[in-house]
Amino acid sequence: MRRVHAQALSTPPGTSRAPIARSAQLEAASDLAADGAMSARERIPILLFFDRLECPYCERALREYLVPMSREAWRGRAIFRQVDIDRPVPVVDFDGTRTSHDTIAARYRVRFSPTVIVVGGDGRELSAPIVGLLTVDFYGAYLDRALEDGVRALGARRL
C-alpha cells in the first residue's frame, strides 16, 4: 500500500515539546472488538487517529478536521477512535485480546504523529495511511478520500 508522508508537519517519537491541553479529541479506542463488530454489521469503516500528547499538529488535525467530521459529515458513516502512540493505555484488540495503545501503534508501524489509518472490522487496512498533517488546504479531502476508500472496500452504500 502506498504511504502518504509529510514529515515536516509530523512529530517524530522522542521529540520534546511542552505538553498541550487538548481542546478537542475523539473517543479513545477502548474496545476495538466491539467497534469491529459494529463496523462489520453496519459495513462502515473505522478511522484510527494515532497521536501523542506533545503534538501540536495532532491538536490542529483534531480541532479543525477530525472532530467536526465525526460529528457532522461522517456521523453514523464511520467510527472514529483515538490511539495514543506513546502510552500503554489498555484496549481490547479486534480479536478480543487485551493489549495497549502503544502495541496497536507498533503493529501498524506508526512512528509519526498524527497518523490516520482507516480499517475494517477485522483491523485490516482499507486505504493508504495518512502520515502528518500534509497540506492543510487538502487535509480534509485526504481524510474524506481515505474514508471513501474504506466504504468502497467494505461494499457499503453511501449514506
Where are the regions that the model predicts?
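Short pre-active-site segment immediately N-terminal to redox-active cysteine/selenocysteine motifs
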Residues: 43-46, 51-54, 112
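N-terminal targeting signals for export/organelle localization
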Residues: 1-25, 159
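Hydrophobic beta-strand anchors of alpha/beta hydrolase catalytic cores
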Residues: 47-48, 80, 116
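Non-catalytic, surface beta->alpha helical segment in thiol-disulfide oxidoreductase systems
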Residues: 106-153
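Conserved redox-active cysteine motifs that mediate thiol-disulfide chemistry
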Residues: 50-64
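Thiol-based oxidoreductase modules, predominantly thioredoxin-like and allied folds used
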Residues: 28, 74-99
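A short beta-strand-turn-helix
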Residues: 26-45
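Conserved helix-turn-beta segment immediately C-terminal to the redox Cys motif
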Residues: 41-44, 63-86
